[in-house]
Amino acid sequence: MPRPRLVLLDFDGVLASYSHAVRFSHLARSSGCAPERVRRALMDDGLEARYDAGLLSTGEYLHQLGDAIGAGIDAASWCAARRASTHVDPDTEACVSALAGRVAVGILSNNGLLMCEVIRALVPSWFPRLDGAMLLSGALGARKPEPAAFQRALAHFGASAGNTLFVDDSATHVAAAAGLGLDARQAEEPAALQRILSDAGLA
């Protein structure tokens, strides 16, 4: 495999640690309901998946979430809960900053559009270098492991599968990307990223 010209990185699980439970609890406190009610509204009823797939606008998503938990949720409250439940290690932050100085880097994440604001707030040092490089499923209109998610990401960067390294914590996503010809590697924790980049000749 040649040295990659593009590196596509998952966010949650690869670049950041993320706790659903912390997020649900944070939203529950701000809305005055139980965390389990938030979890059911987002996960059991498919609301989160529809937003992540681009089937709902941010306004529609927040309105439906508010209806489901019996309290209004605005974008600021949603982003605050997501930030509180997500952590980017300083070593990972520095690793991506250095990597982006050597090769094209994109973030390919199954998230809705509000996540753009969250990532910018969590790791401002990545910007403006990564402006235009955050490819969220809500904007792409496809979620990993759907082939369209990878194909649209490659088209966005004008890259070929054979020159692209893809790193994700999901074995299913890695297998789907590999099936399309990407050099796909699984990182089950953020600390694994540096090793993978070294193996690919990028560190």
Annotate each predicted stretch with a short phrase:
Residues M1-R5, L9, G112-L113, E117-A203:
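Asp-based, Mg2+/Mn2+-dependent phosphohydrolase catalytic module
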Residues D67, A76-G106, P147, P190:
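Short, acidic loop-to-helix structural element flanking the phosphoryl-transfer center
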Residues D12, S17, G106-N110, D168:
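Short beta-strand segments
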Residues M1-M43, A68:
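Active-site neighborhood of HAD-like aspartate-dependent phosphohydrolases
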Residues V22, H26, G46, E60, ...:
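Alpha-helical elements of Rossmann-like donor-binding domains used by nucleotide-donor carbohydrate transfer enzymes
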